């Protein structure tokens, strides 16, 4: 296994999902598939990680993840509302127990009037167990994407019932 600074968080997410018999799917915009890559680095992840959608384009968010176009027009794609709709969409699409999404501005330019480093992570779970985290990150494009993945994995572990957040 390749060791990265993010591997422990991905391993913790896989372990938490395995311990509860839950599954996960990802909907990524600004992270461009990095979160999926981290999950699949972990041995045994195929038991709990169903797959993901990289919905970089707005039309894919609407057409594949079923994000309402009216929501995009009202709040934009860089918003808590869009992040939560993406998480629900990937959960419905795959049948996963949990859907996690990432959207935001990795840079180098602002988007929708939002500063570089503006990030939203959402988790959609069973019985309305949803969470949205807003972050204001500093760094270059790659570091913002990496940090977003780390935080998304932390959110997954923190919101699985009976699991300790770990690696806080």
Regions found by a protein language model. Name each.
Residues 1-168:
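Short alpha-helical segments enriched in small residues
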């Amino acid at each position: 296994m390749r060791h990265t600074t993010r591997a422990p968080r991905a391993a913790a997410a896989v372990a938490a999902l395995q311990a509860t018999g839950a599954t996960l799917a990802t909907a990524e915009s600004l992270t461009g598939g990095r979160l999926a890559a981290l999950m699949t680095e972990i041995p045994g992840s195929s038991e709990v990680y169903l797959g993901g959608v990289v919905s970089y384009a707005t039309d894919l968010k609407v057409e594949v993840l079923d994000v309402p176009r009216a929501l995009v027009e009202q709040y934009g794609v860089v918003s808590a509302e869009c992040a939560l709709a993406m998480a629900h969409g990937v959960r419905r699409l795959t049948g996963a127990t949990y859907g996690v999404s990432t959207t935001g501005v990795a840079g180098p330019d602002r988007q929708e009037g939002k500063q570089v480093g503006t990030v939203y992570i959402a988790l959609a779970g069973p019985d309305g167990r949803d969470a949205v985290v807003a972050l204001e990150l500093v760094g270059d494009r790659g570091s913002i994407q990496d940090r977003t993945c780390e935080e998304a994995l932390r959110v997954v572990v923190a919101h699985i019932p009976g699991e300790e957040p770990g690696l806080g």
